[in-house]
Swiss-Prot record:
Pathway: Amino-acid degradation; L-arginine degradation via AST pathway; L-glutamate and succinate from L-arginine: step 3/5. PANTHER family: AMINOTRANSFERASE CLASS III, SUCCINYLORNITHINE TRANSAMINASE. The lineage of its organism: Bacteria, Pseudomonadati, Pseudomonadota, Gammaproteobacteria, Enterobacterales. Catalyzes the transamination of N(2)-succinylornithine and alpha-ketoglutarate into N(2)-succinylglutamate semialdehyde and glutamate. Can also act as an acetylornithine aminotransferase. Its EC number is 2.6.1.81. PROSITE patterns: AA_TRANSFER_CLASS_3. It holds the Pfam family Aminotran_3. Its cofactor is pyridoxal 5'-phosphate. This is Succinylornithine transaminase. Belongs to the class-III pyridoxal-phosphate-dependent aminotransferase family. AstC subfamily. It catalyses: N(2)-succinyl-L-ornithine + 2-oxoglutarate = N-succinyl-L-glutamate 5-semialdehyde + L-glutamate.
Length: 408
């Protein structure tokens, strides 16, 4: 007999680095989840932009089960067929010539930053070690990546932090230009700042960063952990901008819910990462890469990417209609199915409260700071699920506006 568990057990048994919602999901199908009490939710959170094809997608289950019946793990002393096939698919679909597999976005960004430092040290000298990142960015929770992220709340308790990391203002080329020089080895940037408020970069900003990196022989790293694998209506967001990075990191949606990350780069840059310079026990394991290969097969199609753009329009239209009714948002922004609703001044700081009320109404949404409600639904979310979910979201907005909302 299995152990009966409740939300209270989390507080008893788990390290308290999270504050999970009161509900515990137990089953999912498509863009719907059900909790222990059988209550249904429309999922517009997508596991924070992870569940790109929803829950329990039959093709992903089949790919996982097929590989699970063969073998699970060998370690990095051996390669495997699913990893090689996935690497080739990523290379064929992007600028990349070499791929490094890991287990998460933080690990992918860690690998990218290490590569950039090593390339600069090997080709120029140890003095070329500076990294320029951006305020309010998020690149992961390792000591290196949390230092690159421009949110002191996440890093201030872990000093001393890795040195030679400076932060410019996002979408401000003058601010970046003041920091990038001949001692800079890398610039790391999100094409859309996700945790920082769902803020798309301007084309001029990314083009300017590309030019600055070329001028100072610095590597341009695009963190596409949240924007990658179809989320913006193209396979990767850099394809919207006509700006090609030197290194790209990807994770989240790549596995459709199964943990995987990857760093993509060119042969020249990859060449400095010789045997023993970096590694991972589980990265590129056959279970993860088999599932990710199927995810790419489904998402990297014109039909799916056109569908994302159509669903973007449907969300924007309905959210604008909702905003006419409630007047809660000063701006609705984003790319594809990564959307942010910025709260008006009178509702400032209440994004979490709206998310809590939304869950009570039967729809899951995210926040991006205290003032932005974030949506990252499955890329194949249906018209009916969009309509039902946003009707439920409207109930949450109504409760907040009329003063009926309460914490907890």
């Amino acid at each position: 007999m299995s152990l009966s568990v409740t939300r209270e057990n989390f507080d008893e048994w788990m390290v308290p680095v999270y504050v999970p919602a009161p509900l515990i999901p137990v089953r999912g199908e498509g863009s719907r989840l059900w909790d222990q009490q059988g209550k249904e939710y429309i999922d517009f959170a997508g596991g924070i932009a992870v569940n790109a094809l929803g829950h329990a997608h039959p093709a992903l289950r089949e790919a996982l089960n097929e590989q699970a019946n063969r073998f699970w793990h060998t370690g990095n002393g051996y390669t495997n067929e699913p990893a090689l096939r996935l690497a080739k698919k990523l290379i064929d679909a992007t600028f990349a010539e070499r791929v490094f597999f890991c287990n998460s976005g933080a690990e992918a960004n860690e690998a990218a930053l290490k590569l950039a430092r090593k390339y600069a040290h090997d080709r120029v000298g140890n003095h070329k070690s500076g990294i320029v990142a951006f305020k309010n960015a998020f690149h992961g929770r390792t000591l290196f990546t949390v230092s690159a992220g421009g949110q002191p709340t996440y890093s201030q308790d872990f000093a001393p932090l890795p040195p030679d990391i400076r932060h410019a203002a996002y979408n401000d080329l003058n601010s970046a230009s003041a920091l990038i020089d001949d001692n800079t080895c890398a610039v790391i940037v999100e094409p859309v700042q996700g945790e920082g408020g769902v803020i798309p970069a301007t084309k001029a900003f990314l083009q300017g960063l590309r030019e600055l990196c070329d001028r100072h022989q610095a590597l341009l790293i695009f963190d596409e952990v949240q924007t990658g694998v179809g989320r913006t209506g193209k396979l990767y967001a850099y394809m919207h901008y006509g700006v090609t990075p030197d290194i790209l990191t990807t994770a989240k949606a790549l596995g459709g819910g199964f943990p995987i990350g990857a760093m993509l780069t060119t042969q020249d840059y990859a060449s400095v990462m010789t045997p023993g310079t970096h590694g991972t026990t589980y990265g590129g394991n056959p279970l993860a890469t088999a599932v990710a290969g199927k995810v790419l097969d489904i998402i990297n199609t014109p039909e799916m990417q056109n569908g994302v753009r159509q669903r973007h329009d449907a969300f924007i239209e309905r959210l604008n209609t909702l905003n006419v009714r409630f007047g809660m948002f000063s701006e609705i922004r984003g790319l594809g199915l990564l959307l942010g609703c910025v709260l008006q001044t009178e509702f400032a700081g209440k994004a979490k409260l709206i998310a809590q009320e939304a869950a009570k109404a039967g729809v899951m949404v995210l926040i991006a700071g205290g003032d932005v409600v974030r949506f990252a639904p499955a890329l194949n979310v249906s018209d009916e699920e969009i309509a039902t979910g946003l009707d439920r979201f409207a109930l949450a907005c109504e409760r907040l506006q009329t003063g009926g909302a309460s914490c907890g």
